[in-house]
A protein has these predicted regions:
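Structural motif
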Residues: 167, 219-220
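Electropositive, gly/pro-rich neighborhoods at or near active sites that engage anionic ligands
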Residues: 2-184
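Residues at the starts of beta-strands that form the adenosine-phosphate
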Residues: 167, 190, 242
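C-terminal functional extensions of proteins
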Residues: 231-302
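Residues at the C-termini of beta-strands that transition into short coil/loop
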Residues: 97, 195-197, 247
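Short, solvent-exposed amphipathic alpha-helical segments in soluble enzyme
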Residues: 65, 110, 183-188, 209, ...
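A mid-sequence, solvent-exposed acidic-amphipathic segment
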Residues: 174-218
């Protein structure tokens, strides 16, 4: 009990210091555009590589054993650091908006990001620029973390607009099943899927990249593969594709539809933070047939 009280006290201290610092400081920590501005960039045809706390921590070796479902890899860390500092035409870099703004977050999220900033401040300042324009990687976490839900509908509207009349290629882990069973992809012209390993996808990075490059550049590429997606989005942008590191956006959308107040499991899909990577059977035969018809290739660790 005493340890729990101490931990909560520390969280509260980080939050209060951070809240005061952000309200008083005349120096801008980092320039991070809003979630709406980030979505607008995607609608203009930009690709995005997103860095959450996991990807950022991988760069400065805070997680020596890797992060969930991706083991550590020296080459991967180097690429993540390289892309974080990149300035490629038609490609943007997303970092967490809560590094500079916490007053719109629920308390648990405000505690988390306040502690994250202060315990990683030296490393963050080493790798992040004070002058580079970043975008908000939290487009994939647009609902649950926020007290103000007013932007949610607009973000969803812009997301659907991004897919409208586009041929969409989803490159995802087995059982991710982005957009399956909801209307996110309803306006897309055609949907195809390449399924990849749900764990340690970076081991077959070259194989994944070369397979995608066999596809037409006019397609919108959606990537849901953790830090592997962060790197793929950059390499594909260099090749002339529009590639979006989409992350958990589909799951967030499912929670938004259900007006969930916490992370809950979703039928037919792997929800890493709730059920983990599991092989869920698609019980609806019609839905299963649609899904299987969209799969054009599978890439394994073998």
């Amino acid at each position: 009990m005493g340890l729990k009280i101490l931990k909560n006290f520390k969280k509260n201290i980080y939050w209060r210091i951070n809240k005061y610092s952000l309200s008083k400081s005349e120096n801008i920590r980092y320039i991070i555009k809003s979630r709406i501005e980030t979505m607008d960039k995607l609608l203009e045809g930009h690709s995005i590589s997103r860095y959450g706390d996991g990807e950022l921590s991988l760069i400065y070796k805070k997680k020596k054993n890797g992060i969930n479902y991706q083991e550590d890899n020296i080459e991967m860390r180097k690429r993540l650091a390289e892309i974080l500092k990149s300035d490629l035409d038609k490609h943007i870099v997303g970092i967490p908006g809560p590094l500079v703004k916490i007053d719109d977050l629920i308390l648990g999220e405000a505690y988390f990001w306040s502690k994250y900033y202060y315990t990683n401040k030296t490393n963050l300042n080493k790798y992040l620029s004070k002058t580079k324009v970043y975008y908000d990687q939290m487009i994939s976490r647009f609902y649950l973390p926020y007290t103000d839900k007013n932007d949610c509908e607009l973000i969803v509207e812009k997301l659907k607009q991004l897919f409208k009349d586009r041929n969409v290629l989803i490159v995802e882990g087995e059982n991710t099943r982005f957009g399956l069973g909801n209307e996110l992809l309803l306006l897309a012209k055609k949907v195809k899927r390449i399924l990849c390993p749900p764990k340690n996808a970076y081991k077959v990075y070259d194989k994944i990249l070369e397979r995608i490059k066999l596809e037409n550049k006019g397609q919108l590429i959606l990537l849901a593969l953790g830090p592997t997606a962060t790197i793929l989005a950059y390499d594909l942008a260099k090749e002339g594709y529009q590639a979006v590191d989409i992350g958990h956006m589909d799951i967030e959308y499912e929670w938004y539809l259900r007006k969930a107040d916490r992370k809950i499991d979703i039928e037919n899909k792997a929800v890493n933070e709730v059920s983990g990577v599991v092989n869920k059977e698609i019980k609806d035969k019609e839905l299963k047939a649609v899904y299987e018809s969209q799969i054009i290739d599978r890439i394994s660790l073998d």
